[in-house]
């Protein structure tokens, strides 16, 4: 077991601390890459057990974070993202249990073939190495990222937001003790031990080759900064400007249920719907949909056609179509059928998650095929944009790019591959 790195208040020693942290993580990554699945699963079981046993400690630490955040006047949606309840801590532990049950991807031969000269070539899954995860208000990311990286054989450096520092520290202690119980390096999951914001810039630099990939989890400004400054590859999504399109062939009751859930289940998550598109051929659905949303406490900002259906709708401006509210607000617009919906999403979407509600499978197929988003849904809520709902146990983020990983980034997406070649003495002519 290595000596813990001490937290510091100033930045004078920060570069040295961060480089030491990366070196220890790299050494741990070499051990994890060869660790058997059974040993990793023992660590995960111990982590789950400790999080359940220390739920009160975690919630007490979180209460201090929440009180501090409220004192500086953050938004209700921010408080919701920051808050840990007994149910959310239990869900965190449940997620670890699911990850434990996921097949270990490391060492899996995904393809194998024999060449005419007799050589056998295998494509094999391998860990990425050291992953840096930078996140803001959600303390559960510490657990999700830690266990996913462990299962996939990667070491991880966690840099949580200053708002969730106490919560993350309490969660991290459970993870580290789980590693120790299983005989794995406790530096396999490292929490940056300072709130100093300069740590983010150092992590983005790659720490002299100590970090292989960065995953940001947070708002638009954080992700934009990461993508602009990172000197290593990034798995990132910008905002979730997600749409629900209610087609002319939609069942009204189904549409109401899906729209309400997509917007109001949890308004502060990246899978929340931010724009409602309604087929001009089904304008009779506008009034009941708007009435339902306003009745649930959601502000509706609409175009002229939507405002004509309900005087309580406020005017939408051009910025509304591009806004991730993360709040009880939705923009609403009438479009000319599925083609109009697709055109609007192409112009204003963020390639995250978009849904269609329709009983016409042909129209649904067109939407699913032509909308260029990481997740597209037919007759289901956008709030299913979550690794746990995909059966991944948890997710380290939802990637909206097209390289390496796209959609929920789970265990399998945190691996790369290498080629193993078996010969019998072949030489190249």
Swiss-Prot record:
Enzyme nomenclature, EC number: 1.2.1.41
GO terms for cellular component: cytoplasm
InterPro entries referenced in this protein's UniProt entry, alphabetically: Ald_DH/histidinol_DH (IPR016161), Ald_DH_C (IPR016163), Ald_DH_N (IPR016162), Aldehyde_DH_dom (IPR015590), G-glutamylP_reductase_CS (IPR020593), Glu-5-SA_DH (IPR012134), GPR_dom (IPR000965)
Gene3D superfamilies in alphabetical order: Aldehyde Dehydrogenase, Chain A, domain 1, Aldehyde Dehydrogenase, Chain A, domain 2
Catalytic activity: L-glutamate 5-semialdehyde + phosphate + NADP(+) = L-glutamyl 5-phosphate + NADPH + H(+)
Pathway: Amino-acid biosynthesis; L-proline biosynthesis; L-glutamate 5-semialdehyde from L-glutamate: step 2/2
Stated name of the protein: Gamma-glutamyl phosphate reductase
Organism: Bradyrhizobium sp. (strain ORS 278)
């Amino acid at each position: 077991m290595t000596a813990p790195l001490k937290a510091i208040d100033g930045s004078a020693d920060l570069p040295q601390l961060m480089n030491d942290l990366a070196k220890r993580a790299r050494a741990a990554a070499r051990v994890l890459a060869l660790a058997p699945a059974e040993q990793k699963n023992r660590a995960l079981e111990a982590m789950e057990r400790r999080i359940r046993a220390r739920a009160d400690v975690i919630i007490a630490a979180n209460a201090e974070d929440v009180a501090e955040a409220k004192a500086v006047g953050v938004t209700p949606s921010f408080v919701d993202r920051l808050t840990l309840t007994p149910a959310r801590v239990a869900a965190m532990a449940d997620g670890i249990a699911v990850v434990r049950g996921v097949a270990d991807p490391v060492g899996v031969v995904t393809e194998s073939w024999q060449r005419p000269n007799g050589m056998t070539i295998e494509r094999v899954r391998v860990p990425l190495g050291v992953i840096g995860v930078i996140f803001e208000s959600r303390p559960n990311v510490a657990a999700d990222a830690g266990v996913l990286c462990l299962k996939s054989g990667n070491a991880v450096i966690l840099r949580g937001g200053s708002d969730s520092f106490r919560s993350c520290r309490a969660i991290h202690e459970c993870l580290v003790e789980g590693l120790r119980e299983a005989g794995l390096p406790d530096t396999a999951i490292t929490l940056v031990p300072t709130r100093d914001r300069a740590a983010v810039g150092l992590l983005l630099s790659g720490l002299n080759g100590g970090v292989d990939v960065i995953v940001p989890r947070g708002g638009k400004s954080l992700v934009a900064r990461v993508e602009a400054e990172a000197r290593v590859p990034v798995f990132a999504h910008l905002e979730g400007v997600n749409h629900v399109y209610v087609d002319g062939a939609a069942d009204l009751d189904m549409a109401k249920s899906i729209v309400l859930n997509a917007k109001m289940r949890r308004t502060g998550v990246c899978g929340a719907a931010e724009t409602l598109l309604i087929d001009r051929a089904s304008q009779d659905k506008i009034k009941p949909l708007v009435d339902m949303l306003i009745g649930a406490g959601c502000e509706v900002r609409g175009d002229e056609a939507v405002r004509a259906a309900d005087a309580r709708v406020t005017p939408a401006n051009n910025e509304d179509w591009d806004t991730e509210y993360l709040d009880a607000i939705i923009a609403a617009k009438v479009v000319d059928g599925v083609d109009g919906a697709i055109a609007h999403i192409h112009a204003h979407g963020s390639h995250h998650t978009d849904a269609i509600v329709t009983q016409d499978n042909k129209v649904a197929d067109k939407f699913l095929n032509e909308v260029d988003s990481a997740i597209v849904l037919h007759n289901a809520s956008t709030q299913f944009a979550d690794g746990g709902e995909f059966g991944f146990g948890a997710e380290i983020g939802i990637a909206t790019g097209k390289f390496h990983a796209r959609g929920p980034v789970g265990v399998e997406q945190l691996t790369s591959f290498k080629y193993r070649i078996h010969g019998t003495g072949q030489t190249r002519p």
